[in-house]
């Protein structure tokens, strides 16, 4: 399916270079996955720094800026995310959204527990609760990519998404 629009000569060249569809798919999405890991790591580091400074209230209140940053990031890696979200069936990434959310939920649970223990957060969240909220959140964020919306429209929708997901209220900052 990935090579559908190519002529036979190009298909042969593709399959010579890659051991199969899975290897080709992996090569196409690898830069996106690496960029995601870098972004997640940087965001996590920033959040813990703000937690240590007791600045989570201002971070949570300024949610629109990082949300637009995430949306911009998705569009910088648009092709990779389209593959992961719309064309990964039959690959090890067929459950990308669920796997991404599960990892994010584990990280968020540790963060939420730390914030609660330090009395920065007044709400003790449970793991399944975080998982459900993050599933909804990331599903909404990925929707513009899945539906091929223009970047400008997706950035515009960030205002509504930010209102819907009031992290300050969810975490009790």
Language-model segments: residues:
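Single conserved hydrophobic/aromatic residue that forms the stacking wall/gate
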Residues: 1-10
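C-terminal peripheral helix-coil segments that are non-catalytic and often amphipathic
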Residues: 76, 106-114, 130-173
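Short linear capping/connector segments at secondary-structure termini
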Residues: 50-56, 84-91, 120-122
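Short hydrophobic/aromatic patch on the recognition helix
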Residues: 10-18
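Amphipathic alpha-helical packing segments from all-alpha helical-bundle domains
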Residues: 61, 69-76, 90-117, 128-135
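C-terminal/domain-terminus segments
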Residues: 84-101, 156-169
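Alpha-helical structural segments
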Residues: 16, 23-47, 61, 65-69, ...
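Solvent-exposed, amphipathic alpha-helical segments
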Residues: 35-46, 80, 136-144
